[in-house]
Amino acid sequence: MQRDCVSPTKLENRIKKIVHKPFFKIALFSTTSMTVLGSVVIAPSLPALQSHFQNIAGIDFLSKLVLTLPALFVMLFSPLSGYLLDRYGRIKFLFPAMAIWSLSGFSGFFLDNIYLILVSRAIFGIATAFVMTGATALVGDYYLGEDRQKALGLQGFATAVGSAVFISLGGYLSSIDWRYPFLAYLLGIAIAIFAYTKLFEPHRKKTKKTHKEVEGSNQKFNFLMFLPVYLLVFFCMVAYYISPTQIPFFIVHNLGKNGDIVGISMSASSIAYGVFSLFYNRFRNIWSIYGIYALGLFLMGTCFLLLYVFHNYLIVMVSLMFLGAGGGLLIVNSSSYLLSIAPEMQRAKALGFFASAIFLGQFFSPLMTQPIVDRMSILGLFLIFTCLLYMLGLFFIFKSRMKKNFRKLQS
């Protein structure tokens, strides 16, 4: 009863103090980082997994599907998760999803059937949809304005640091046995318990009027307004996911390195992703949305240009840092822009489709890139994506210039 009597201003001030506490941020951003760990942690074990199931027909494709199948189910269930989270709240779905995420991910450790592993990865993807949408929606609920831009940068940094640590660990564990990286998913249980003690349901009015507003906002959801962001994110994730789906094979087969080296290489990308995400707010204070898009695309394009021209391990490390830097800017920039234009009562729904675009890109990445590798070799793949990313970057430079000229004419 006492809580209901608190004025909105006092309540908002109290919430603002809570959400800026260090342990609260650790709980929140650990939760958001879980979704990325879901894929990268097992990437170094793919060559060994493929060898283990070498007698299975189509294992070349199925082994990559172990990594990307969750993305398909995230794509399918993220819009539903967004609707449910907007309608009924965030927390009641988030914590059960985190538990399912951990258990279904861990099951790959003891399953010895590639098809059962794929089933477990599908369940894992459904849980990921709720965790990713719920956690990112909480960031949008807890923080506003510049605080939100900083929070999104911290989210990207926490995700990347966790990714770097666990993909390195995954690379080391995969050098022992391909099953061991699946043990890392048990960390989700510890994160869920810690988050349960810190996170809370954001203050939302629960009057009949609000429920009608929610129903109206659901009917008026303007998908086309967000579509350009979704398409751009989809393409960027197709390009970004060349790293875990194709480059491990390039390192092992073309450069003759071991699985533990693959993990270290992937972690270089994650570290750069985190650093550039962390400083996103500073980039945003200098450059426009279009300018940051152009920078991110040029950085990613430079990665594939270096891989195409130079064929040694040091260049792979440097190029993956370019890829991570560009990917970090692009995803955080898109998240920030999306949260700034999405109405409050449609925030989770907009983020649900955003998650769908991200994971749809992850799922389609090997489907779109493997035929190019088969026909033109992996070097041909690098050249094609160099050209595509540079051309798209030039497009955003043109858009940025046009916008500046339009403002000058208005003034």
Predicted regions and their residues:
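Helix-loop-helix hairpin linking two adjacent transmembrane segments in secondary transporters
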Residues: 145, 154-200
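Central cavity-lining transmembrane alpha-helices of secondary-active solute carriers
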Residues: 65-82, 267-279
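Helix-to-loop junctions at the C-terminal end of transmembrane segments
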Residues: 77-89, 276-288, 373
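Extracellular/periplasmic helix-loop-helix junction of adjacent transmembrane segments
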Residues: 46-75
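Extracytoplasmic gate region of multi-pass secondary transporters
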Residues: 226-267
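Paired small-residue
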Residues: 100, 104, 115-123, 314-322
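Cytoplasmic helix-loop-helix junction between adjacent transmembrane helices
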Residues: 114, 120-159
